């Protein structure tokens, strides 16, 4: 006699964690006396970055919005406390949060500095236990990092993300196959990830105003109006996106790597521009090495004091992740494509046409260029080793010691 055992298909269970008011909350971890007071993280008005980057719940109560000017925010709330951003603190807390997430799953996918998806899918896992995991994470965040986090639990990445948005701060929302139609479908279509202003307008033009409308809309109409993304959104509205959580270590490789900044005063000489490009090139080169990539082209973006912009791009003679080579060709682009008599307000460098270093066979030349490339690479390797051992400021390029160093925030030329 034969016996057949029914094997239950493993349900996908995905957690989305969103650190509440992250920039503003991070500041409270260093100064608890600010708790409960209206607080906004803002750019420095003296350095031409005077907008609100983030705010806490107390500031939100005054109607203060992200990206509005500090002057406007102060008009709404004269007692508003403004502080400068502390990106080293944000990166440190974000990394600490990922450590906590990784103790519950090997699959943790970052979505910006303050959000992560965590794949809890396992034959022994169910939604009740997943909610317990989410609540445990919330408790640990408060105890270990002094941060609050909102969690969404669902069978879909889109719904998990939406769940973390439904209740804030410090809450857990479960969107299951049994309740998603009552919880999600009445919401406006823009509540769904990937529905921005233009997509919302396109959907509204089709008579689609809620997630439920989108879920039940004809696939043909969506495909005609929005192409493949229209069908993708319909699937997402039905919880059928099927997108997996990408392990952070196995994240997709970027198509380009860039670094840019607005100077605290206009750059007026070629030497200052070159120093800035060296600073950007070193940051970009470090990222390229971390990804194991080589760049096939370099680009420069320049903005004048009159906010007139220029974007310049050119292929590189050979694939590289060397900062000196990137800066050299970026500077040549700048000299050939931008008026030398026009000051520079903002500038950036971008490396594109990227290829995995492990798959690339560098072609050799008989005319001496590989010797120079090898020399520059040895210099860069030595600089990185010195910085790793003695700190970022232990060694700098001479070009970065001129007056351009005063045109950017402290620490800009640290590689």
Regions found by a protein language model. Name each.
Residues 22, 45-48, 305-308, 354-357:
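Short, charged/polar surface micro-motifs in flexible loops or helix N-caps
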Residues 117-122, 311-316, 364-368:
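Short, hydrophobic beta-strand segments
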């Amino acid at each position: 006699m034969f016996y057949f055992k029914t094997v239950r298909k493993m349900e996908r269970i995905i957690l989305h964690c969103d650190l509440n008011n992250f920039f503003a909350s991070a500041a409270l971890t260093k100064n608890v006396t600010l708790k409960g007071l209206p607080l906004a993280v803002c750019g420095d008005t003296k350095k031409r970055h005077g907008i609100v980057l983030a705010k806490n719940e107390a500031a939100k109560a005054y109607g203060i919005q992200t990206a509005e000017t500090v002057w406007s925010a102060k008009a709404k709330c004269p007692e508003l406390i403004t502080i400068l951003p502390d990106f080293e603190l944000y990166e440190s807390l974000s990394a600490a949060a990922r450590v906590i997430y990784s103790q519950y799953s090997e699959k943790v996918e970052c979505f910006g500095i303050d959000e992560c998806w965590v794949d809890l899918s396992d034959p022994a896992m169910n939604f009740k236990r997943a909610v317990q995991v989410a609540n445990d994470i919330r408790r640990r965040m408060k105890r270990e990092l002094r941060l609050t986090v909102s969690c969404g639990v669902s069978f879909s990445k889109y719904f998990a993300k939406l769940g973390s948005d439904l209740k804030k701060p410090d809450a857990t929302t479960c969107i299951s196959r049994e309740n998603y139609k009552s919880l999600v479908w009445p919401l406006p279509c823009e509540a769904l990830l990937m529905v921005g202003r233009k997509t919302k307008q396109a959907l509204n033009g089709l008579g689609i105003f809620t997630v439920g409308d989108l879920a039940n809309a004809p696939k043909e109409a969506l495909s005609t109006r929005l192409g493949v993304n229209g069908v993708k959104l319909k699937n997402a509205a039905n919880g059928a996106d099927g997108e997996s959580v990408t392990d952070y270590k196995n994240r997709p490789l970027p198509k380009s790597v860039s670094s840019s900044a607005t100077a605290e005063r206009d750059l007026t000489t070629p030497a200052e521009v070159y120093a800035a490009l060296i600073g950007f090139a070193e940051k970009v080169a470090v990222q390229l090495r971390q990804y194991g990539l080589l760049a096939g082209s370099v680009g420069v973006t320049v903005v004048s004091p009159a906010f007139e912009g220029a974007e310049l791009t050119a292929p590189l003679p050979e694939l590289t992740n060397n900062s000196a080579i990137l800066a050299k060709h970026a500077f040549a682009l700048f000299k050939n494509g931008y008026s030398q008599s026009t000051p520079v307000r903002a500038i950036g460098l971008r490396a594109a046409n990227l290829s995995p270093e492990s798959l690339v066979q560098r072609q050799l030349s008989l005319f001496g260029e590989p010797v120079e490339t090898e020399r520059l690479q040895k210099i860069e390797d030595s600089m990185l080793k010195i910085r790793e051992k003695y700190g970022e400021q232990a060694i700098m390029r001479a070009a970065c010691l001129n007056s351009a160093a005063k045109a950017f925030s402290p620490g800009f030329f640290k590689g």
